[in-house]
């Protein structure tokens, strides 16, 4: 009798709806399947472009319940690379990133909004140069699925823009150069 009761309860539990949780991913920086690039107008005539070579992060994502998503990214600001050694030294100085005092930047999401057609708005707190302010990353889902090595991956692209002075960056190159645009490519490996 006890065996039948246990079997019935176990069978009934399989019929109950199960909660679907967002999957956890680690950003694939080891395989170089992610990047954080920046661009700043150079006096209104051209653009200075560069990237951060060292960062890591994680995110949670469920396409059926996007609003449950979470993102966290840590950036080694000493890894700034604009392909020009003297400029990179200046970018690390207290005129810009002040890496001696603030060697890391961090983004932590506070909300993720589904805008339809794979578009997401990821709002969160960006900590840079000792200042934390909200920013919104306008992102797009590239795709997700099995990889050839037996894992599962999800990929996104996104961008955001902010004013340097909002983050205590002292250098003033004029109004044409006041903003920084960040372009992000993220591929995560499901954990």
From Swiss-Prot:
Its main location: periplasm. Keywords: Periplasm, Signal. InterPro entries: Lipid/polyisoprenoid-bd_YceI, TTHA0802/YceI-like_sf, UPF0312/YceI. Residues 1-22 form the signal peptide. One of its GO terms (cellular component) is periplasmic space. It is found in: Periplasm. The keyword Transcription does not apply. The keyword Ligase does not apply. Pfam families: YceI. Coiled coil: none annotated. Belongs to the UPF0312 family. Type 1 subfamily. This is UPF0312 protein Sden_2128. The lineage of its organism: Bacteria, Pseudomonadati, Pseudomonadota, Gammaproteobacteria, Alteromonadales.
């Amino acid at each position: 009798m006890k065996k039948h009761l246990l079997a019935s309860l176990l069978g009934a539990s399989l019929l109950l709806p199960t909660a679907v949780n967002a999957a956890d991913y680690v950003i694939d920086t080891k395989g170089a399947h992610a990047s954080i690039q920046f661009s700043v107008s150079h006096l209104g005539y051209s653009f200075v472009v560069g990237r951060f070579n060292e960062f890591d992060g994680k995110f949670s994502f469920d396409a059926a319940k996007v609003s449950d998503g979470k993102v966290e990214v840590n950036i080694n600001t000493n890894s700034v690379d604009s392909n020009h050694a003297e400029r990179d030294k200046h970018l690390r100085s207290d005129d810009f990133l002040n890496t001696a005092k603030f060697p890391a930047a961090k983004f932590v999401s506070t909300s993720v909004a589904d805008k339809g057609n794979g578009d997401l708005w990821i709002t969160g707190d960006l900590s840079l140069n000792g200042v934390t302010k909200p920013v919104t990353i306008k992102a797009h889902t590239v795709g997700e699925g099995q990889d050839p090595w037996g894992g599962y991956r999800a990929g996104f692209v996104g961008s955001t823009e902010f004013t340097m002075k909002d983050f205590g960056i002292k250098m003033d190159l004029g109004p044409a150069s006041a903003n920084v645009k960040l372009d992000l490519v993220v591929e995560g490996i499901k954990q």
